[in-house]
């Protein structure tokens, strides 16, 4: 089997395609969470602690000199990134928890009895007819 055909067999497997779709959706979800944290969560928190915008929090290690930009330790962006991570992790946890609950409900739900075959149906009818004949006086 050539290298190209092996790669093709690997790439078209369901798990690889599912993983690729998951990565793409995850990247888009990350952008949504970043916007949620930066635009919805952080402004009220900043307002509560005195109107501070977390993304602007930084410590200047060395001031700008001429064309050389300042050396800044931007810990506000780090705090915002941590909140992004916590919210994404919590959302994933809740999703996995919901999926596990659905799997447990499926496992607990009784399955319908199998449909009897034509032979079983015929034998049941014969049995019922024989019982009916025995019960006649």
UniProtKB/Swiss-Prot annotation:
The source organism is Pseudomonas paraeruginosa (strain DSM 24068 / PA7) (Pseudomonas aeruginosa (strain PA7))
Q: Which UniProt key words apply to this protein?
A: Cell inner membrane, Cell membrane, Ion channel, Ion transport, Membrane, Transmembrane, Transmembrane helix, Transport
What membrane topology does the annotation report for this chain? Multi-pass membrane protein
Belongs to which family? Belongs to the MscL family.
Q: Which PANTHER family match?
A: LARGE-CONDUCTANCE MECHANOSENSITIVE CHANNEL (PTHR30266:SF2), MECHANOSENSITIVE CHANNEL MSCL (PTHR30266)
* Entries under Gene3D superfamilies matching the protein: Large-conductance mechanosensitive channel, MscL, domain 1
What's a Gene Ontology MF term here?
Answer: mechanosensitive monoatomic ion channel activity
Places the protein is found: Cell inner membrane
Q: Pfam families this protein is in?
A: MscL
Entry GO terms, CC: plasma membrane
Q: What does this protein do?
A: Channel that opens in response to stretch forces in the membrane lipid bilayer. May participate in the regulation of osmotic pressure changes within the cell.
User: Which PROSITE patterns does this entry report, sorted A to Z?
Assistant: MSCL (PS01327)
Query: Main localization of the protein?
Result: membrane
Question: Which segments cross the bilayer?
Answer: 9-29, 79-99
Oligomer and partners: Homopentamer.
Cite the source lineage.
Bacteria, Pseudomonadati, Pseudomonadota, Gammaproteobacteria, Pseudomonadales
Q: Which protein is depicted?
A: Large-conductance mechanosensitive channel
């Amino acid at each position: 089997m050539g290298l190209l055909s092996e790669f093709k067999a690997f790439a078209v497997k369901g798990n690889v395609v599912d993983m690729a779709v998951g990565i793409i959706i995850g990247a888009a979800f990350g952008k949504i969470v970043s916007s949620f944290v930066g635009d919805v969560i952080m402004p009220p928190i900043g307002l509560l602690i005195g109107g501070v915008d977390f993304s602007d929090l930084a410590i200047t290690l060395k001031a700008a000199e001429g064309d050389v930009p300042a050396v800044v330790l931007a810990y506000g962006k780090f705090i915002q990134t941590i909140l992004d991570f916590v919210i994404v992790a919590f959302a994933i946890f809740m999703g996995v928890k919901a999926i596990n609950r659905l799997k447990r409900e499926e496992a607990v739900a009784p399955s319908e009895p199998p449909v009897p075959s034509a032979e079983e149906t015929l034998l049941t009818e014969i049995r019922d007819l024989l019982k009916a004949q025995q019960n006649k006086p």
